[in-house]
Design a protein with these regions (language model features):
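Non-catalytic all-alpha helical scaffold/repeat segments
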Residues: 1-162
Length: 162
């Protein structure tokens, strides 16, 4: 049975999201995306029904890319999808496992609590939990090597996996 991310890849809204992501470039001045791009992304994420659901799922998978290009906009418009009080949270986290990047320590600090909470949720698929456990291990190794400073310490990691 395909998951929502797979559905999004083949749906018009998911394809539209992918096109917008490909057009999203880093600005020369380090600022946010243009107003025109913001309007397009916002129209897509605010769409109702399955069209909007699949668009949000598709964008959730690329949240590290979005955050890198437009941190303020992503924080204001996308990160709330990952909060467990959102009806989109399970689908957002499930699609997030397909991301090619864990994301920056800054991004992880903004989704730290729901990230740690997902390990105790009964509505998450086992293979999703395994993927995120791998991410947790990678963050701990990166912290230990001094490469970076993810906002999750060993005690929090251990407690979330119990």
């Amino acid at each position: 049975m395909p998951d929502q991310f797979t559905e999004a890849l083949n749906a018009p809204s998911g394809r539209l999201a992918e096109i917008l992501l490909k057009k999203l470039t880093r600005t020369d001045d380090g600022g946010e995306m243009s107003e025109e791009m913001q309007a397009r992304f916002e129209k897509l994420i605010r769409a109702e029904g399955e069209f909007g659901d699949l668009a949000r799922v598709r964008l959730a998978a690329d949240v590290p890319f979005l955050f890198d290009r437009a941190p303020r906009w992503t924080t204001e418009n996308i990160l709330s999808l990952f909060d467990w009080s959102s009806p989109d949270a399970r689908a957002a986290w499930s699609s997030r496992k397909y991301s090619t990047s864990i994301g920056s320590p800054e991004l992880m600090s903004l989704v730290k609590e729901p990230f740690l909470q997902l390990f105790g949720r009964s509505d998450m698929e086992e293979n999703d939990i395994e993927t995120f456990a791998d991410w947790l291990a990678a963050m701990m190794l990166a912290n230990q090597s001094g490469e970076t400073d993810y906002p999750i310490n060993a005690t929090e990691a251990r407690a979330s996996l119990r």
